[in-house]
């Protein structure tokens, strides 16, 4: 994956840590953003769906028509190339579905939910279920008590296998499992998520993740996935399991992998603090994320990779205004804005090695600020 893409903000020192309250307010940041950045156009938003869908169809057509007739050595190279390209484009569509959940697609909530439901269901994601848990994450980012996901553990609570596998081969194994199965395991078992009094997942309408008024839509999300699975069953009957796996299954798994890598890197970095209830507030939490540079993939992924800090502050800004809004608020954020342009594979390895558990900030009277550390 890419690194070293273009942008106006220079790389900040890796170990720079800012945990004091910012000298500005959300209102100050909002006033710095040009008003048109908050405008959502259903026509412009729909253009990106059509654009991505056409490219996805072209990739599908080429893979279905030509890869099977290639000689074996070339086919073994062509399939992984198709999987990467198709997964990249489908992740872009997933990002648009995610924007629908933030009401950033159009001025009409029903349009946003309809589009998001279709896109996410096709990509095997329970739209409403994830929308609601993701809303909780945005409301409580980096709160050790209330955040919904990516909640780090203290040194004493780190699983034994992390200690046993604290070497390069073991780290590779953990990374492989984390980045391939992390999102499905989170949806099914709430792994790395907020601890509830009973078992929680994204498919049970009675899960403690959801409020009473949300339960019907959680069921609707399940029905959407069942409809897609029925379509997969028909495709398997018509074309065979191997064809469906290669054309659809592996690219969707690739979407999950992209999601895991992107969100992990957005929320895992030595410069990102976590807070307990004595120190946390919404603005502090929203600023405790970091932008990443995925090179040429930034545009393919609709800039979700390097506008994440802005997104946590103003999640209803559509992606086609995100870079302009980011640059506008950076004049106010100053050192409170974080971006790391380390090449992505290198960053993944470094974070997996350095960010194992959290410890209280040293030299403070309050113990409410925590930082990543390693064994």
UniProtKB/Swiss-Prot annotation:
In its UniProt record, a GO molecular function of this protein is: acyl-lipid Delta(12)-acetylenase
- Which superkingdom heads the taxonomic lineage of this protein's source? Eukaryota
Query: Which cofactors does the annotated protein need, by name?
Result: Fe cation
- Primary subcellular site in the record, as a coarse category: membrane
Q: Name one GO cellular component term.
A: membrane
Q: How does it sit in the membrane?
A: Multi-pass membrane protein
Q: Where in the cell is it found?
A: Membrane
GO biological process terms, semicolon-separated:
unsaturated fatty acid biosynthetic process
An example Pfam family from this entry, by short name, is: FA_desaturase
Instruction: Give the residue interval(s) assigned to the motif Histidine box-1.
Output: 98-102
- What is this protein's function per UniProt? Changes the delta-12 double bond of linoleic acid into a triple bond in the biosynthesis of crepenynic acid.
What protein name is recorded for this chain?
Delta(12) fatty acid dehydrogenase
